[in-house]
Design a protein with these regions (language model features):
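Sec-dependent signal peptide recognition
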Residues: 15-25
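N-terminal secretory signal peptides that target proteins for export/translocation
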Residues: 1-15
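A structural motif
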Residues: 105-120
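Post-signal peptide N-terminal segment of mature Sec-exported envelope proteins
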Residues: 40-58
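A cross-family detector of function-defining hotspots
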Residues: 55-109, 136-187, 193-198
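C-terminal motif of bacterial Sec signal peptides marking the signal peptidase cleavage site
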Residues: 29-31
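Second-shell loop/turn segments in exported
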Residues: 46, 125-132
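Bacterial signal peptide processing site
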Residues: 33-35
């Protein structure tokens, strides 16, 4: 009988030790997770290198009037295209039909393509006001922009579409704001954000 008591006591002791070990592991995992903070809402970007969307007074460094630089295609909105100083990046600024001169509603940053005819700038690189630029990791982007996105084929899409509840959309009088971030091998290779054409 005393042998049975010893076995029960030993079994109970092992169970308690196992529970304590599991609690220690759980606490350490939760402690590590606290260091990773993510936003649960989107803070929209509205500018690239201080070139603000929907602002006719915001001009591209070195260009005061872009009406002669506008490219009109059949498949997309009219746009103006720029390169950074080292010709490693492209900035495409899209205009809406009927918009005022130099009034852009979408911005797209991508790697330089030698086939592209573009306007040179003095900017070292292109980045948004929240610090988003080509080459950052998906993890870093999510830390900055938040975790409320839809991911499809290596593209993270953030969207604000509730006009009735969004002071941001109301301010710009636009129905939908979007931001799309394309990744290749966990590196950001394309940024496209702005307002959808109504």
């Amino acid at each position: 009988m005393s042998q049975l008591k010893l076995e029960k006591h030993s079994s109970r002791k092992r169970s308690i030790l196992l529970i304590i070990k599991l609690l220690i592991i759980l606490v350490s995992v939760l402690g590590c997770a606290k260091n990773e903070t993510y936003r649960d809402n989107i803070v929209p970007d509205i500018s690239v290198n201080n070139i603000k969307l929907s602002d006719t007074t915001s001009v591209v460094l070195g260009y005061s009037d872009l009406k002669y630089n506008v490219i009109e295609g059949k498949e997309e909105l009219p746009y103006v295209i720029f390169t950074n100083e080292n010709k490693t990046e492209i900035l495409k600024l899209y205009l809406f039909y009927g918009a005022k001169r130099n009034e852009f509603y979408q911005a797209e940053i991508s790697p330089y393509d030698k086939k592209t005819i573009s306007n040179p700038t003095k900017y070292k690189n292109f980045s948004t006001e929240s610090g988003i630029k080509l080459g950052i990791s998906k993890k870093d982007l999510i830390k900055i922009k938040g975790n409320i996105f839809v991911e499809t084929n290596h593209v993270l899409r953030y969207e604000i579409s509730d006009y009735e509840k969004s002071h941001f959309l109301e301010k710009y009088n636009m129905p939908i704001y979007f931001a799309e971030y394309t990744f290749d091998q966990d590196k950001l290779c394309k940024i496209h954000f702005g307002f959808e054409y109504p």
